């Protein structure tokens, strides 16, 4: 019975949440994807640079 009360309470709280509208959600999604792509490229270049540096030191 406690689990049923828990889920009812969760439902009540979820109705109180202020969910983003369509344009706002799209803007947030684009921001997140752009940030992820930036960091993927950044760390790939950093990894390549460090690998090349280590290769030069070892040789």
From Swiss-Prot:
Gene3D superfamilies: Preprotein translocase secy subunit. PROSITE patterns: SECE_SEC61G. One of its GO terms (biological process) is protein targeting. It is found in: Cell membrane. Its main location: membrane. It comes from the Bacteria. GO terms for cellular component: plasma membrane. Component of the Sec protein translocase complex. Heterotrimer consisting of SecY, SecE and SecG subunits. The heterotrimers can form oligomers, although 1 heterotrimer is thought to be able to translocate proteins. Interacts with the ribosome. Interacts with SecDF, and other proteins may be involved. Interacts with SecA. HAMAP family: SecE. NCBIfam families: secE_bact (TIGR00964). Belongs to the SecE/SEC61-gamma family. This is Protein translocase subunit SecE.
